[in-house]
Structures are given as C-alpha cells and as structure tokens.
Design a protein with these regions (language model features):
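Gly/Trp-centered helix-boundary motif
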Residues: 1-153, 157, 161-162, 301-313, ...
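Alpha-helical transmembrane segments of integral membrane proteins
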Residues: 123-339
Length: 339
C-alpha cells in the first residue's frame, strides 16, 4: 500500500528491506498504537463521562467544562459525575477507566493501595490511579523526546552541513563552537535554570535541544564533506545551480542516512532521560504525570508497594525496547553495504 506512493527507487529498496525485519515492523505498529492510545488518553481514562443525556439534554463533559448550575447543583463548585443524581431516562457513557491522573481514590483505606478492579495498577502514595498516570505520562515522555530530537536534528544538520560544505574557516570556527558547547556541564546548568525558572516541558525541551545538537552536527559535517565533491554535485554546479539549491536539493537528501538511522535511538534516549530527571526531582513540575516520578515513589515504598516499581518499569522497558527494535530495522535498511 505504501509502496505505490514511493517514487524513488533507492527509497523503495530501503522500505522493502525494512519490511523484511518482522520484529521492526511489529515494533513500529505497536509504537503507533501506543502513540494513538496516549494522545487519546482523555477518551480512555477520565473522571468525566464521554457523553451524558440528562433531563432531555445532551452533554459532553469530557470535552466541555460545565458549571454545576447547568445540572441544577447549587451547593458545589464542581460536578462530581460519579455521585451525580440522574433521572431514570438518563444515559451516561463512561471511558474505560473512570479516573483522571490528578484525583485521589478516597474509598481505599490507605495510600498506596494495591491493584483492584477499580484501580488496575493500584494507586500511588497520594491515591492516584497508576494506570492513568502511566497513560498520560507517556504523552509527556514522547512529546519531550520527539521535540528534542526534531530541534536538535534541525540545528545539528544545519550547522554541521554548513561546516562540511564550506570547509576552511567556516569549518574551523564551527568546530570550536561545538567544542565549547561540549564543555558545558549541562546537568548543572539544568539545575540552575530550574532553580531560577518554573520547571516545565518547554524549559526542559529548550535546554536539552540547545545542548543536544552536537552529535548530529558531526554526522552531518562528515556526510557533507564526503558528498560535496561528488559527480552529481559538480554537475549541478556546472548547470549554474545556486549554493542553497545544491545544499538542500542535492547534498542534504543524500546525507540523511546516518541521521535517520540514529533517530529511534535518540528518541529512546530522550524518554529515559526525562524519566531520569523526573526520578531525581528535576523534571516536570509536580503533579504532572511522569514515569520517573512513579519510579521515585517506588524507591520510597519498595517493600510495601511492588506495583509502583513493576508497572512503570515494565512500561519504560517496553517502550525503549520497541524503539531499539525499530532502530535496528532502520539501520539495516539504510546500511550502504546492503545497497
């Protein structure tokens, strides 16, 4: 199905080689499914119904915030849909899990509480549903990892490509800039920034991207150095092509192989990196759902709450394992020895 949209013969060969790696294909499918599930989390786990018909009117609480007065409730500032008195002809459609990632289960005796039919993966030390926080937390992990990868790749390819194409003084000064950035203690800088500014996903992405492009620049520089004097580039120069056209039209598409190869591994490193920061308390602001924060709770409650270690660890291992399988498939597909 996809093959009919691929016009480039080399790209088609690479795609067919990737398809031969069944483990990589299955891992890709599972990752796509996991992306859909986490970004559709409000439809799967929510303390508000997806649809409600009440007193002859239709409501969509999961998508629209309603005032208690809309339901004739005068003695509350919020609507507790679980305890709301409904008419006999009312219809309520709930998500699969009736918890949001921030609310506590007040019906259990103590926190953290073990897995039950109400809380599949148990609750954390504040009574919040672990399954829901894992589902929502994955969205932040993926968003962080992909954003850092995109920004770092763009900056690294741009600067590395310019160093490789022009060489000479541009390459010399560019290399010195890379060396300066490599000497910066990123973790200490991150701690300083968090102590000054309010921790957020944007801040973490910004700092990680500013100091995460150097590795990409090395690969881009090497590829541009190798490709800038090849015959097809010389032919483009002879036909009067501009520098920008030569860089972006001819050299860049033929220099992306190593960069694309490392993309799944880079994203996996981003997921584990954010989990590590959250585990140490330097990541997303509390009470944002986070895998690392759940693992930190597991460390504190290891002897009494095995589920806090088991389920977050399994989620982290599974996601990283799937990205590694995809990365292996991409690496084999783009391997020049397989051309």
């Amino acid at each position: 199905m996809i093959e009919k949209y691929i016009e480039n013969e080399l790209t088609l060969k690479r795609w067919r080689r990737f398809k031969k790696r069944k483990t990589a294909v299955i891992a890709s499918i599972l990752l796509v499914v996991s992306f859909i599930l986490t970004f559709a989390a409000p439809l799967i786990a929510n303390s508000k119904p997806l649809y409600m018909s009440h007193n002859g009117k239709s409501y969509f609480p999961a998508f629209v915030d309603y005032h208690p007065k809309d339901f004739g409730i005068a003695d509350s500032f919020y609507v507790d849909y679980r305890k709301m008195a409904l008419a006999e002809d009312s219809l309520v459609i709930w998500p699969i899990v009736k918890w949001n990632p921030y609310e506590s289960n007040e019906e259990v005796e103590s926190y953290p509480s073990k897995p039950t039919s109400s809380n599949w993966f148990g609750t954390d030390d504040r009574g919040r549903d672990v399954f829901t926080r894992l589902l929502y937390g994955y969205k932040y992990s993926i968003a962080y990892a992909i954003l850092v990868w995109i920004i770092s790749t763009i900056v690294g390819v741009l600067l590395g490509g310019l160093m490789g194409y022009f060489g000479g003084k541009v390459d010399f000064f560019g290399q010195r800039v890379v060396e300066i950035f490599n000497t910066v203690p990123v973790f200490l800088l991150l701690l300083t920034m968090i102590s000054i500014f309010k921790p957020s996903l944007f801040l973490l992405v910004l700092i990680s991207s500013i100091f995460g492009w150097m590795g990409v620049s090395y690969y881009a520089r090497g590829e541009f150095l190798k490709n800038r004097n090849l015959e097809f580039v010389e032919a483009a120069r002879g036909m009067g092509a501009s520098t920008s056209r030569i860089i972006f039209k001819h050299i860049l598409p033929n220099s992306l192989g190593p960069i694309i190869t490392f993309a799944p591994f880079t994203i996996a490193a981003g997921i584990s990196g954010l989990a590590g920061l959250d585990y140490l308390g330097f990541g997303l602001e509390v009470p944002t759902p986070s895998w690392g924060e759940l693992l930190a709770q597991a460390h504190k409650n290891f002897t009494i709450a095995w589920w806090l270690a088991t389920f977050p660890s399994a989620a982290l291992f599974s996601s990283l394992f799937l990205f590694v399988l995809v990365g292996d498939g991409v690496r084999d597909a783009l391997d020049p020895k397989m051309q």
